[in-house]
């Protein structure tokens, strides 16, 4: 019997796979459910989102099918070999007992030496009792009397392993199922494939393609492989794209020829092969290579790491893909939250701006109409005077239309005379219309540029934000048409609109007062005389009054129509914004947190598969939500700090998951503590609770400890600059820290600072207005729930007070407060730290500005940073900053 330690370690490898497969299956199931709910319940509310964005918040079908196939695949050990004897020998070694007959007990040799092999396929499964049965692959058990049924046995009877001559075709295809109470079989099934002449390899492998994850073992009993066996290996590689573990089961000879054959087919690495621990080598592209075990004595050293890597590769690839989907959609949710928040803020402002600017435009144009009547009169007189001679010449040379003239110029009828007079009048009116309109248009040109263009752009934005409502499109288009008609004065005058016809009809009525006693001759002089009389009969005052009156009437009408249309548009936006706000709340409170938790689980699964569970060292400190331990090394990094967090409820789980996502999404920055990874410990406190282990960069000490130990002024000012740089980076990524304090600033051995503990860190669009932070460092507006990134500036001001004081002693004003509630009350009333005698005037002014009660009056960190640099250069010397850097 073989060493029982061998199957025990192999069993542990499969046990780990099955345990992690359960976590992966659960995460995938919840992920599919999540995306199904998004698709079913929010298809209508997400209609406002871009179609491309909406399609991204989904589970790609090919990825879902691949992951479903991975989690549903059961691990199998497939045993192939040069002959049945080699297969059986390997199986016995694997299980640690002589279960299959060897040597003379097994009967004749198979293959080329022993003729046609009649040994059938074997399948080993777990059961409480040892039993044998024949069954069709994947179907049902056959009623068949086996030799093993006739009495006790330790080794499977040879006749049960062989296909009998009298058996029908169904029994010939049947496989022998051997049920054993064995620890290895509790975790994995084993299949021993038959020789090629019993069942072609292609057919045998067909059953191995569906729903199994194969660990392929190939038993070698000779010095080299035959051409047929090499062909079979090529078929195996094409059918099952998994690495193969080749195992020599015979003791004699070296393995040079065998190694060369396998390396030439790229079935194993052509280099030295395995590392000292027996783990298989990997190709440069990352694809796992097969391995060669030169004896059964080394099976344990080679097979266990080989199996672990095959199983791990499969699960790591699946967990990575799943986490990629989680992160992509989570980032999209956060982007949509920003877009929805901006929509909720900007749309009411756009509506108000449109209403306000239209009012200003209306008042400006109305003022022109009221103020410039006298100017218009003078303009008309001046225009007539400058155009008079040209008008008379044009009238004199006018060719009448639709009138048949006699050769001597006499008209045919009195009706034609009226037509001639009318055409001369029209000539004068049209020329005067054009000249006056051009001058009037120039007087309001600047209004078109400064008002109408902006109004139209604003209306266009409002229209685009309601694409689902046809009514709103009609309203907005109508609104723009009104603007074009009412305010594009040049278009209205030049197009001969109703305005022109109305007041120029009055002009023609004035001209019609000219009376004719006798029908004159239609000569050039007569045309000039008619034009002269028409021009002289025009009243500039009446014309100006008529123009202004019509202008005012049109303006009033357009203004009222504009206001009505805007109200209708606003009503439509109100309903849309209500739906947007509801969706924004769902994204912040449900969608993003749920997806973040799934992302944390998939990422943690990937990390534990790749790097294992970290070992906890001594305790370094305790916080409100977790304990920090030392961790010597993890994932090739050392030393590390490990923060153990046990979320008490779903809310804390979600907050932790979002924190992890924001932190992992951040680019590396020298002023932020690096987060290396996470592991979910399901066995924490003996399995009574689940802990999340966050593994991060280990630094020397925190700022609180550093100040207690004593730091020079130069070091303290440099720390202040480091903290400002770190906060600025967070803000540039759209994040707020919300808990800047001494304990959350860590120092390295050179006393350079890094910000840690992003537990309250969130994007502005994802904040729910919750009151978080450390009371002493909390800005007054935090208590209202409405705040922005200036709360970090306030907290830095308090931190800077400690840095300038060089001590961890509480400010006197805060030390007097008996409770947290009293402290909050005093801070809201304006209570701030006192000025200490050691403070530099410029430092005091800077911290006072940072903790200003009005958030809008606090300085931007881009102003604070150069201010700190100048303070440091003044107090510590010009070159001190450069030397420190």
Curated annotation (Swiss-Prot):
InterPro entries referenced in this protein's UniProt entry, alphabetically:
Dual_SerThr-Tyr_Kinase, Kinase-like_dom_sf, Prot_kinase_dom, Protein_kinase_ATP_BS, Ser/Thr_kinase_AS
Q: What is its EC number?
A: 2.7.12.1
Its Gene Ontology cellular component terms are: anchoring junction; apical plasma membrane; basolateral plasma membrane; cytoplasm
Q: Name one GO molecular function term.
A: protein serine kinase activity
Enzyme class, one word?
A: transferase
The UniProt entry's GO biological process terms, in alphabetical order, are:
cellular response to fibroblast growth factor stimulus; embryonic organ development; negative regulation of apoptotic process; notochord cell vacuolation; notochord morphogenesis; positive regulation of ERK1 and ERK2 cascade; positive regulation of fibroblast growth factor receptor signaling pathway
List the active site: 739 (proton acceptor)
* The family this protein is said to belong to: Belongs to the protein kinase superfamily. Ser/Thr protein kinase family.
Query: What role is this protein assigned?
Result: May act as a positive regulator of ERK phosphorylation downstream of fibroblast growth factor-receptor activation. May induce both caspase-dependent apoptosis and caspase-independent cell death. Plays a role in the embryonic development.
Question: Can you name this protein?
Answer: Dual serine/threonine and tyrosine protein kinase
The organism is Danio rerio
């Amino acid at each position: 019997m073989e060493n029982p330690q061998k199957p025990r370690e192999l069993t542990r490898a499969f046990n780990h796979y099955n345990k992690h497969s359960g976590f992966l299956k659960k995460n995938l199931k919840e992920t599919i459910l999540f995306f199904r709910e998004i698709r079913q319940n929010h298809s209508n509310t997400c209609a406002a989102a871009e179609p491309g964005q909406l399609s991204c918040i989904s589970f790609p079908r090919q990825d879902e099918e691949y992951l479903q196939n991975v989690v549903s695949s059961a691990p199998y050990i497939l045993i192939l070999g040069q002959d049945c004897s080699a297969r059986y020998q390997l199986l016995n070694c694997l299980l640690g007992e002589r279960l299959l007959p060897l040597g003379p007990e097994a009967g004749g040799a198979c293959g080329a030496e022993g003729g046609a092999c009649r040994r059938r396929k074997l399948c080993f499964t777990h059961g409480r009792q040892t039993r044998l049965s024949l069954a069709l692959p994947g179907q049902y058990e056959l009623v068949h009397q086996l030799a093993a049924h006739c009495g006790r046995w330790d080794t499977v009877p040879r006749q049960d392993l062989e296909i009998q001559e009298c058996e029908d075709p169904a029994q010939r295809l049947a496989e022998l199922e051997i049920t054993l109470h064995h620890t290895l079989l509790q975790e994995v099934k084993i299949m021993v494939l038959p020789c090629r002449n019993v069942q072609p390899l292609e057919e045998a492998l067909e059953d191995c393609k569906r729903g199994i994850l194969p660990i392929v073992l190939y038993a070698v009993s000779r010095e080299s492989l035959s051409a047929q066996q090499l062909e079979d290996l090529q078929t195996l590689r094409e059918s099952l794209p998994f690495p193969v573990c080749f195992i020599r089961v015979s003791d004699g000879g070296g393995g040079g020829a065998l190694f060369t054959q396998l390396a030439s087919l790229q079935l194993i690495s052509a280099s030295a092969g395995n590392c000292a621990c027996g783990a298989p080598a990997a190709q440069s592209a990352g694809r796992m290579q097969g391995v060669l075990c030169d004896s059964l004595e080394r099976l344990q050293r080679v097979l266990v790491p080989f199996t672990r890597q095959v199983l791990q590769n499969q699960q790591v690839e699946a967990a990575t893909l799943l986490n990629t989907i989680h992160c992509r959609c989570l980032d999209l949710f956060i982007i949509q939250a920003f877009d929805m928040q901006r929509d909720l803020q900007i749309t009411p402002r756009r509506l108000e701006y449109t209403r306000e600017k239209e009012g200003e435009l209306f008042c400006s144009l109305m003022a022109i109409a009221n103020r410039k009547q006298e100017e218009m009169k003078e303009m008309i007189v001046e225009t007539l005077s400058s155009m008079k001679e040209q008008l008379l010449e044009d009238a004199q040379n006018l060719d009448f239309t639709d009138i048949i003239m006699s050769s001597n110029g006499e008209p045919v009828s009195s009706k034609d005379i009226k037509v001639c007079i009318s055409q001369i009048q029209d000539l004068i009116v049209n020329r005067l219309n054009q000249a006056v309109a051009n001058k009037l248009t120039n007087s309001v040109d600047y209004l078109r540029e400064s008002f109408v263009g902006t109004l139209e752009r604003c209306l266009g934005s409002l229209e685009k934000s309601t694409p689902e409502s046809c009514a709103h499109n009609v309203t907005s288009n109508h609104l723009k048409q009104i603007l074009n008609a009412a305010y594009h004065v040049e278009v209205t005058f030049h197009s001969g609109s109703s305005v022109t016809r109305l007041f120029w009809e009055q002009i023609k009525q004035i001209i019609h007062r000219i009376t004719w006693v006798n029908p004159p001759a239609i000569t050039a002089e007569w045309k000039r005389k008619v034009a002269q009389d028409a021009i002289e009969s025009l009243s500039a005052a009446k014309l100006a009054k008529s123009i202004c009156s019509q202008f005012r009437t049109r303006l009033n009408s357009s203004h009222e129509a504009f206001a009505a249309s805007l109200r209708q548009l606003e009503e439509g936006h109100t309903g849309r914004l209500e739906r947007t706000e509801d969706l924004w709340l769902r994204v912040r409170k449900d969608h993003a947190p749920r997806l973040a938790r799934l992302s944390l689980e998939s990422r943690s699964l990937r990390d534990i598969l790749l790097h294992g569970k970290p070992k906890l060292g001594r305790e370094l400190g305790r916080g409100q939500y977790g304990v920090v331990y030392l961790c010597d090394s993890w994932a090739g990094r050392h030393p590390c700090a490990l923060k153990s967090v046990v979320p008490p409820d779903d809310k804390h789980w979600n907050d932790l998951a979002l924190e992890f996502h924001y932190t992992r999404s951040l680019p590396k920055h020298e002023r932020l503590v690096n987060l290396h990874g996470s592991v979910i410990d399901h066995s924490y406190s003996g399995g009574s609770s689940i802990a999340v282990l966050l593994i991060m960069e280990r630094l020397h000490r925190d700022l609180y400890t550093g100040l207690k130990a004593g730091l020079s002024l130069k070091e303290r000012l440099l720390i202040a600059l480091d903290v400002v740089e770190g906060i600025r980076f967070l803000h540039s990524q759209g994040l707020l820290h919300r808990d800047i304090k001494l304990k959350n600033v860590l120092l390295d051995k050179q006393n350079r600072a890094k910000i840690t503990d992003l537990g309250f860190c969130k994007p502005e669009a994802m904040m729910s207005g919750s009151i978080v932070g450390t009371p002493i460092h909390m800005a007054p507006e935090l208590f209202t729930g409405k705040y922005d990134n200036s709360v970090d500036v306030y907290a830095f001001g308090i931190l800077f007070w400690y840095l300038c004081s060089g001590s961890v002693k509480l400010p006197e004003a805060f030390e007097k407060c008996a409770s947290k509630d009293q402290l909050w009350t005093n801070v809201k009333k304006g209570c701030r730290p006192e000025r200490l005698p050691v403070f530099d005037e410029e430092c005091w002014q800077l911290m006072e500005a940072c903790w200003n009660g009005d958030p809008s009056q606090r300085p931007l960190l881009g102003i604070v940073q150069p201010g700190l640099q100048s303070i440091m250069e003044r107090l510590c010397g010009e070159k001190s900053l450069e030397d420190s850097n």
